[in-house]
Amino acid sequence: HSIRRRQRQMCIRDRYPVYERVVEMAEGAAILANVDYKVSLISGIYETLVNRSGGAIMQNNLEILGPIEYSNEEIEFAKKIQEVTSKPQDGMDSEIRPLMDTREHPGGGSTDVGDVSWNVANINVGVATAPVGTPWHSWAVVACGGMSIGHKGMLHASKAIAMTMSDLYQNDELVKRVKNEYLERKGNEVYVAMVPEGPPPVNDN
């Protein structure tokens, strides 16, 4: 039998001791049961280091671009998606909201972007590619991504990213601000990938 242990919503400096404790527990259980055991670390992901200096640049460019405009056909498609997924039929929401505050406890989810953010300053942008309330990781999102609603969102995000990169290329002061915040948030932490070197143990998953 296998024992699976997931650790989420923990900063990396706290996660290693917990992982080591879990390994010790597995070893103790194996000794008590007089059986062999094997530990396979299948995945391990760092939390994402935010960069508000970079986020402010991206936010400014989103506001320059303005909200995405949708056709009547796209809005009707969005409402149909909401109907079949039992969501309020509110259509699309293209409002550009203010840059959100950095939350101490941002909630669940994980991404290897977190690992990247410990090696280089990272700027994220979120743009609508599906109707309000659409369940993520579902066929409904895929359906929207395969038609103009998703295409418009992807192009809008691409424009905001390109404009942000252009700002950084042309303004050394902006680069300095982003880099300084990255170094301050990272502190003295040294990035070490949690997953061991070599091919991933996919057969153990």
What are the residue ranges of the model-derived segments?
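Zn-dependent metallopeptidase/amidohydrolase metal-coordination segment
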Residues: 75-158, 176-205
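Generic beta-strand/beta-sheet core signal
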Residues: 9, 40-42, 126-128
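Generic structural signal for well-ordered, non-membrane alpha-helical segments
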Residues: 12-15, 19, 47, 51, ...
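Short glycine/serine- and small hydrophobic-enriched flexible loop segments
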Residues: 162-170
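Acidic-enriched catalytic cores of C-N bond-cleaving enzymes acting on peptides and small amides
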Residues: 13-40, 47-91
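Beta-strand segments within the central parallel beta-sheet cores of soluble alpha/beta enzyme folds
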Residues: 6, 37-43, 73-74, 178-182
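Divalent metal-coordination and catalytic microenvironments
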Residues: 58, 116, 161
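Single conserved hydrophobic/aromatic residue that forms the stacking wall/gate
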Residues: 1-12
